[in-house]
Amino acid sequence: IAALHEGGVEMETILPSLRTIPQIEGRMERIEEGQPFNIIVDFAHTPDGLEQIFKFASSITPKEKRIIAVFGSAGKRDTKKRPIFGQLADKYCDLIILTEDDPRDEDPLQIAEEIASGIAKTNRILIESRYDAIRQAIEVANVGDTILILGKGDENFIYREFGREPWMSDPAAVRDILRRYYFEPEEEEDHETAE
């Protein structure tokens, strides 16, 4: 926008064109499947990225409703940021569900504990399986709440000790869970690596 405007294009010309720009999957992606609460998937995986999405969620969530965050931290990356992630979530969220996010050869629950060390007051749950963590968030959400699924965006893999493992992607997991368990509850199945 700034480059176009600096190049002489009037804002009145630029702004209407923004409506035709397609959504970038996994970046501030709202999942709308008819559920009575907000679900936003975002790639945020840095302190600044998390704070920005938390602030946005605060701006769209009524004061009496909850912000529920599902996220983790990548293994073998920026370990000193983990407590900071917890502090930021503690400041903005009402429920924090910590889960795996590219653990590589680290224990996902140990990573979650390091994030949790920055959480002072907010209720938190540790669920290793990313699919199950997303499902838990959807199951506990109430009308008007906002769920944030953070860290992986639309990536369709999870880095583990042995390399890349297929992952359905966060947007696909949300839609699958809504369809299977929220709108049409079915028996338990394992959907960890479904595509």
Label for each model-derived stretch:
Residues 2-195:
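ATP-dependent carboxylate-amine ligase
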